[in-house]
Amino acid sequence: MTGERGLTYAEAGVDIDAGNAMVEAIKPLVRSTRRPGADAEIGGFGGLFDLKAAGFKDPILVAANDGVGTKVKIAIETGRHDTIGIDLVAMCVNDIVVQGAEPLFFLDYYATGKLVPGVGADIVRGIAEGCRQAGCALIGGETAEMPGLYDGSDYDLAGFSVGAAERGALLPRPGIAPGDLVLGLPSSGVHSNGFSLVRRIVAASGLGWDAPAPFAPGRSLGEALLTPTRIYVRPLLAALKATGAGAIKALAHITGGGFPDNLPRVLPEGVGIALDLDEIAVPPVFGWLARTGKVAEAEMLRTFNCGIGMVVVVAADRIASVEAALREAGEAPVRLGRITPRGEAPVTFSGSLAL
């Protein structure tokens, strides 16, 4: 080809070579997520998964996608990018396991104004860690460099996961009724919801991300707030397997909307949930947020998980076996309340949060 040299894609702000270099850098991370059904090799046009090799006989597929909201902004402003990928995986696979399904594979979308391969590799390092925790394979993704759409090297993330359950094993199960008991599984902190409010409170406090965290001795504020979302997949799948059909009737991932908005999603018509807030060991971060931002308890409950990241609805006569199975899997279940006849509100509270 001859002729006068014109503009190049790189001069327009898109560096294909940087993208290719990043793909090569992350291949070992991706391979570390191999599992039955997937070899976790990337570079082709699509990722493959073999359901038969994964051991399923008559599966129903379950899909979920999510992001991590403005928690990404804290990762960007602190320069800490190696755990935000764990959050991305958690937000998707926790939504899959509440259906009674095993997460099988994961794909990510990473969009940025300017691709910095080291940052991208750190993000994928977290994604791979999340996939290993969940037992799912990272089989593909997309890195999009879009100058002019994002400011500098700012970025956003989205995740996509697919899981499977044998036909007839899906949750919630029919028969949720008054008298069933409700367990809570502790969160690691704020997880990945409510960060627009978190960032507003931090700004009002006058603290920088590198300041000592008032609620976490020995850690900076940014580091503490970036604590990754817990992934509940392995303990919940272990408990479902150990206790058999009918013991665990429903699971609810406590994300945006908190208890009031997420619990009704798994309830049939005519029943509600009564929770005793006195039973929750509220992590110190929530007390600091509530006091510093003067956030009312009702707003805390509808914005944050307040210390409980997953709720488990259990048949009353199977409660001991479910608690034992969860403890055996490393969880610390808390008895939060019970299923009741539906009143004016589907979720009612007694006691108060220790904020």
Swiss-Prot record:
Enzyme class: ligase
Pathway the protein contributes to: Purine metabolism; IMP biosynthesis via de novo pathway; 5-amino-1-(5-phospho-D-ribosyl)imidazole from N(2)-formyl-N(1)-(5-phospho-D-ribosyl)glycinamide: step 2/2
Annotated InterPro entries: PurM-like_C_dom, PurM-like_C_sf, PurM-like_N, PurM-like_N_sf, PurM_cligase
Cellular component terms per the entry's GO annotation: cytosol
Alphabetized GO MF terms: ATP binding; phosphoribosylamine-glycine ligase activity; phosphoribosylformylglycinamidine cyclo-ligase activity
One Pfam family cited in the UniProt record for this chain: AIRS_C
Key words, A-Z: ATP-binding, Cytoplasm, Ligase, Nucleotide-binding, Purine biosynthesis
EC number: 6.3.3.1
Catalytic activity, as annotated: 2-formamido-N(1)-(5-O-phospho-beta-D-ribosyl)acetamidine + ATP = 5-amino-1-(5-phospho-beta-D-ribosyl)imidazole + ADP + phosphate + H(+)
Gene Ontology biological process terms from the UniProt entry: 'de novo' IMP biosynthetic process; adenine biosynthetic process
Location in the cell: Cytoplasm
Protein family according to the UniProt entry: Belongs to the AIR synthase family.
Protein name: Phosphoribosylformylglycinamidine cyclo-ligase
Lineage: Bacteria, Pseudomonadati, Pseudomonadota, Alphaproteobacteria, Hyphomicrobiales
Primary gene name: purM
